[in-house]
Amino acid sequence: MFTGIISHVGKIESITQIKDWEISISIIDYDSSSIASSFHSLILGASVACSGICLTLKKIENNFFFFDVSHETANKTNFLSWKVGYLINIERSLKVGDEIGGHFVYGHVDTTAIVKSIDEIKGSYKIRFLMNGNFRKFIAQKGSVTIDGVSLTVNKTKQNIFCVNIIPFTWSHTCFRSYKKGSIVNIEIDVLARYLEKLQKISLDN
């Protein structure tokens, strides 16, 4: 489980496909100049959110962190758009006693969305996303949504489009700074919205 508060940015160093995919990631500090020492305490088998995708750490070698990515994960997320040099958001899993600064995030990507526009407004950024119509019912104004692993508040919604505001700190400390029009992002729906929809279906069936 995660909170959607990004601690570091990772850079894809290699992508290898045999049956599934293997990726290696270097964890970089916010100044992009050095490996983040805080990640050297990770143990093999640990869960790490990589742009909102919960992946299992399988190997650490030469300051690179290796993960496997299955076909199921690749087909349901934006993974197939990742390339060497691609920046991703990184969050270690939540521990008992940690501060919950965002909302509960599970690392289970529901769908993807496309960046429609990015507007800078006095140092902050307004980003509009186009998402799959089947999931629009889960996006509510002032509700929570996870975009590439980041816990955010929905500012406005209109049909299949919703927008969020990104403050300067979040922009500079996440992979959002590399977004362009047409970028594909991972979306995780707030778990409360999913359960409410399930309860509503059960109620209607009865």
Predicted feature residues:
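Conserved loop->alpha-helix
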Residues: 1-206
